[in-house]
Regions:
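Short glycine-/aliphatic-rich beta-strand segments at the starts of folded cytosolic domains
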Residues: 22-39
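C-terminal partner/receptor-binding element of secreted or periplasmic proteins
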Residues: 91-118
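C-terminal motif of bacterial Sec signal peptides marking the signal peptidase cleavage site
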Residues: 12-15
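Bacterial signal peptide processing site
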Residues: 17-19
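Positively charged n-region of N-terminal signal peptides that target proteins for export
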Residues: 1-5
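Helix N-cap motif at beta-to-alpha junctions
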Residues: 39-40, 83-91
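Surface-exposed aromatic
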Residues: 69-84
Length: 118
């Protein structure tokens, strides 16, 4: 009987410990994805896949992400700036974008950027 009482008392004491809530990290800066060219135009399949992903994300997510496409060259080069705007899910979005575009030729991903400056 003492053993059971001791066990229940120990269980009660250990279950009363304060549990830490997970810390939410706010992503700092924006994400810039550059589609470059070396004389034959950009990787259109990667650009189309990326743009479709952003549009699909915005169709399902709340809050949505703002992005801006800027032409940067004569061969169709583009910079896409995806703005964090304090979105708590932005770090996960950045990881998905990195996975989506991993191994794509002539695509450069820059994290923690200021899209107002280059």
């Amino acid at each position: 009987m003492r053993l059971i009482t001791s066990f229940l008392l120990a269980l009660l004491i250990t279950s009363c410990t304060h549990k830490m809530s997970p810390t939410v990290v706010i992503y700092q800066g924006d994400l810039r994805v550059s589609f470059n060219s070396i004389g034959s135009g950009i990787n259109h399949s990667a650009f189309d896949k990326f743009k479709a992903y952003l549009d699909d994300y915005n169709a399902k997510a709340d809050p949505k992400v703002a992005y801006q496409i800027t032409s940067t060259g004569r061969e169709g080069e583009k910079d896409v700036c995806v703005q964090a705007n304090g979105n708590r899910n932005f770090a996960g979005l950045v990881q998905h974008i990195n996975d989506l575009l991993k191994g794509e030729k002539w695509v450069n991903i820059q994290e923690h950027q200021d899209c107002g400056k280059k």
